[in-house]
């Protein structure tokens, strides 16, 4: 399976025109995507294989008295592409971006019954 993992930057909106089923919770609005990508400290990694088949969104939380932290907001992979290590690759790429931005910690949360996410 040939999947490209890459960060989205402002102006990359066209890459998100084709999105596989169940990658995001709701339909992606172009205005929200543009605002998200333009916001300082907001980062998005996508998995591309004939369109977006996975996404990982994170925000940097900066503190006055301690090291910055990376908060992973969302991770989603289309069911047709799950169990191929895509989520792990996106998380690893996001952790690397966090380190580059000076984050000393990363936080990832999920629901107790989300067995696939807990396996990461």
Model regions: which residues?
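Active-site rim helix/loop that mediates acceptor-substrate recognition in acyltransferases
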Residues: 24-49
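Residue-level recognition of the GNAT/N-acetyltransferase active site
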Residues: 78, 111
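Conserved active-site alpha-helix within GNAT-family acetyltransferase domains
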Residues: 88, 112-120
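Conserved GNAT acetyl-CoA-binding A-motif
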Residues: 98-110
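A conserved beta-turn-beta hairpin within the catalytic core of GNAT-like acetyltransferases
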Residues: 61-72, 82, 101-104
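Conserved beta-strand in the GNAT
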Residues: 51-60, 71, 76
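Conserved acetyl-CoA-binding loop-helix of GNAT-fold acetyltransferases
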Residues: 77, 83-96
């Amino acid at each position: 399976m040939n999947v490209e993992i890459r960060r989205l930057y402002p102006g990359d909106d066209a890459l998100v025109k084709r999105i596989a089923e169940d990658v995001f919770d709701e339909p992606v609005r172009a205005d929200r995507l543009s605002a998200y990508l333009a916001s300082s400290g907001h980062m998005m990694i996508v998995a591309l294989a004939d369109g977006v088949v996975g996404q990982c969104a994170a925000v940097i939380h900066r503190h006055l008295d301690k090291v910055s932290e990376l908060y992973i907001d969302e991770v989603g992979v289309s069911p047709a592409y799950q169990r191929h290590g895509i989520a792990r690759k996106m998380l690893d790429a996001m952790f690397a971006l966090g380190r580059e931005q000076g984050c000393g910690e990363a936080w990832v949360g999920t629901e107790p019954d989300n067995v696939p996410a807990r396996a990461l």
